[in-house]
């Protein structure tokens, strides 16, 4: 964050690259200056970085506000959009820039409140609600589908070649894409009235065939998201009861998908999912491709927080949640992993064999976990062969929404329960 502050422009704009500056990603890249210090606080419960970086965050918000066209309400700092997404051109960048502007404001309201800046917290909360209302008003049509601002100078702007015919002005068009629904749902930006429609729309975009920007029809359960949408799609699916689709999306191996590069020999995460293919070699796609790039690896968060179910209960993980989500499609029969928290290793593992779900977990010393285990009834849950509620370090809390809920003290546990 120090490097980002070192190259922050006098306008308040964060550059895409630090510490050397430069770049053209706009709001979608610059928002790292807001999101990273907030996520660092949530992960480690250390407000020091947030306090130190807060003036730079506030300056960036002032910059974002200065980019708003008073006539349209849209930001002029929106370039790359859903970079390398198969339907990037179908959505455009204005939708995502507006979403991230609102998301940044929501974070600022929480950060200001945490740091005791009450006046700032109220100001940013009001700004957030205003931007969220604008987002729903402008980017959701009467049919409860999302819209994108399409056309104009393109993602890099500019005047074009001398004598060239200027492009038509941008216009709002239907943008019925995975990214639009995933981002709006994942960030919590859609209004309560719009949410049910957007959930159905997201499910439809995942389960159907979709045409990419080149007009090629891609198979069902293809990953039609780019750098921005990929970070939100699996979370949005699981949060809204569509974990079967999240797993189908995960396990598809046809292009575009997470597993496609693996079938082409990938041992790292590529910037382009087809940066190299067995059939065509590099095929020109390596002209702008990193073979060690984070963005499509954002699914790792979902694997940790949803498949394994390791989630923060409070900042810092002294209290955390274990909420495993076994694969309802039956294709994936086990998962195991861990997170090394400040208090020690949090381990979570599930396996489905026949009609039995086996779940094991490790809770570090000086922490407690709340376990949500899929179970038709609490009486069916066993820990090391005995009724779970009678096991040392296990306290039954309630049964809700098809899950038995327990509080776990530090220790290692082995649960079994019939599959529901």
What are these model-predicted stretches?
Residues 244-420:
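Non-catalytic C-terminal accessory modules of carbohydrate-active enzymes
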Residues 138-142, 172-288:
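Extracellular polysaccharide-recognition and catalytic grooves
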Residues 92-96, 220-221, 290-291:
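A short glycine-threonine-serine/GTX helix/turn-capping micro-motif
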Residues 32-35, 52-59, 96-110, 119, ...:
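Generic recognition of stable, solvent-exposed alpha-helical segments in well-folded globular domains
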Residues 33-49, 100-118, 180-193, 232-241, ...:
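Well-ordered alpha-helical scaffold segments within catalytic/enzyme domains
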Residues 1-16, 23-24, 28-31, 42-99, ...:
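Active-site acid/base region of carbohydrate-active enzymes
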Residues 2, 6, 62, 66, ...:
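Generic alpha-helical structural context detector
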């Amino acid at each position: 964050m120090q490097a980002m502050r070192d190259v922050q422009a006098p306008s308040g704009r964060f550059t895409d690259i630090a510490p050397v500056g430069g770049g053209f990603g706009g709001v979608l890249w610059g928002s790292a200056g807001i999101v990273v210090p907030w996520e660092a606080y949530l992960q480690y419960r250390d407000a020091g970085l947030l306090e130190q970086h807060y003036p730079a965050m506030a300056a960036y918000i002032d910059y974002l506000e200065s980019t708003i066209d008073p006539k349209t309400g849209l930001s002029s700092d929106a370039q790359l959009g859903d970079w390398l997404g198969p339907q990037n051109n179908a959505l455009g960048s204005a939708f995502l820039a507006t979403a991230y502007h609102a998301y940044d404001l929501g974070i600022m309201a929480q950060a200001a409140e945490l740091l005791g800046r009450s006046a700032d917290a109220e100001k940013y909360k009001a700004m957030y609600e205003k931007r969220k209302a604008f987002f729903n008003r402008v980017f959701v049509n009467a049919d409860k589908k999302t819209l994108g601002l399409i056309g104009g100078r393109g993602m890099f702007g500019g005047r074009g070649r001398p004598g060239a015919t200027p492009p038509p002005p941008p216009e709002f068009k239907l943008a019925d894409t995975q990214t639009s629904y995933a981002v709006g749902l994942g960030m919590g930006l859609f209004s309560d009235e719009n949410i049910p429609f957007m959930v159905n729309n997201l499910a439809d975009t995942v389960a159907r065939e979709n045409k990419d920007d080149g007009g090629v029809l891609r198979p069902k359960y293809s990953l039609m998201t780019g750098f921005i949408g990929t970070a939100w799609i699996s979370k949005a699916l699981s949060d809204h009861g569509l974990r079967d689709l999240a797993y189908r999306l995960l396990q598809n191996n046809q292009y575009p998908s997470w597993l496609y590069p693996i079938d082409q020999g990938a041992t790292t995460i590529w910037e382009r999912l087809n940066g190299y293919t067995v059939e065509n070699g590099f095929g020109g796609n390596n002209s702008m491709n990193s073979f060690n790039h984070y963005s499509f690896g954002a699914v790792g968060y979902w694997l940790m927080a949803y498949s394994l179910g390791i989630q923060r209960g409070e900042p810092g993980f002294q209290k955390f949640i274990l909420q495993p989500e076994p694969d309802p499609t039956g294709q994936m029969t086990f998962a195991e992993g861990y997170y090394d928290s400040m208090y020690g290793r949090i381990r979570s593992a599930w396996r489905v064999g026949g009609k039995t779900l086996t779940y094991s977990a490790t809770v570090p010393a000086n922490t407690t976990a709340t376990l949500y285990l899929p179970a038709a009834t609490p009486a069916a849950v066993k820990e090391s062969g005995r009724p779970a509620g009678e096991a040392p370090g296990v306290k039954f809390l309630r049964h809700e929404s098809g899950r038995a809920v327990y509080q776990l003290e530090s220790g290692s546990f082995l649960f079994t329960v019939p599959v529901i």
